[in-house]
Structures are given as C-alpha cells and as structure tokens.
Amino acid sequence: MSDPSGNSTTGIVRRSTTDASFSTDDQVKFTSQGGDNAWPCGDYLNIWVCDLSGGLLGYAQFPGGACNTDGVVIDYLYTGTTGSTPPFDLGRTATHEVGHYLNLRHIWGDANCGSDLVSDTPTHDNSHGGCPTHPYHTNACGGGTSPNGEMFMNYMDYTDDNCMNIFTSGQRTRMRNLFGAGGARLSLLSSQGCVSPVALDAGISAIISPTGTFCATTITPVVTLRN
C-alpha cells in the first residue's frame, strides 16, 4: 500500500495532540486544529480515531461532501484492540459509520416511522438500543409495515454490537451503486493507494572520478547510479 507520496505505508498515521477530546465539528480532520489532515478522498477512505466528547461513538460524512472532511470518525474506546467498552466492543461502530460513508441512512430514517430510502428494510418506529427479542414492534408503524417485526439487528440501527448481524440486499445494492459508472466512490477502485511503492534500491555502480589516491580535503565525485 502506498501513501499519497508513493511511499510504503500501513495506512496508520499517529499524531500527538494537545486537544483532550474532539466533537462533530471536524477539528480532528485538520492538522492546524489538533487533528490530522485527510488523505485524498478519491484514493482513500479516511478514518480518524480519537477521544470523542459527549458519549458519541462515531460519525461519518455521506458521499458528495467536501473532500478535506470526507471519511469516518470513531471514538478510540470502540475500535481496534483498544476498544474494550461493552456493549460496543465488537467493531460494529466502524461497520455502522462506514455504512453512512457508503450512503446508507439510519434504518428508521431519522424520524418516527421514517424512510431509509431502501425498499426491503421494514419501517421502524424509531431507533432501538440493547438487544430486543425477535419479533419486535410488529407493524408498529401501521399494518404491513413490519409484519415480521422491526429489523433491530441491522447494522444501521443503534443496538448492541453482539446484536447486529445484517445488511439487506437493498442496502448492499445502494452501497455498490457508489462504485458504478458515475458513482461517488468509483475512484476508490483505481486508488493510487493500491499501487505498489517504487523500490528505492538505487546504488552506485561505478566511480568515474576521482580515481586512484586523492588527498584533497574536498572532492566533487562523478559516479554512475543504477536502480
């Protein structure tokens, strides 16, 4: 994997900051504000991990926004091997937020009985927490809206990590459409980050001058380099 300069990278950049925590104002996305600048959004999915204030687990930017703020932000307690804060300790915060990055809405449409713009998700009366027992809230938004109960196990709800386990076919299609012709995330498929770094193995193959013994305090060598 290559960084924006073409150098080999793990994709992880660590930054020391004097900011005790960050919020949803995107300061974490700018070096000048205590965070770290985004890599080019056409080539990389930027994920910032930091201390988020207010009990927030994470947030994301939908496709089509400003490139220098594009990506996902996750509280350090809820991601990686450091994330050990149940019931959000299985990585589903990243799954949920990357879902937003890939154009998925909350399954309840951010409104009572709202729409998430996906036809095969049942209508939800609201967000759900914990881990309800299935079937749950059958037809809570009216006859036929959720005959098998609301899909609280969907990654785009707010239930516990060990309760989430599904994207629907419609959600999958909505995400994949971003990588089709004209899609907002299409450029990621030809990302410069996937180009192997150029091996920096140049060396001196011959010394043209000086030759023999040379006792001057300074020299201007002429050499042949080969990569």
Model regions: which residues?
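Extracellular (secreted or membrane-anchored) zinc-dependent metallopeptidases
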Residues: 1-5, 10-200
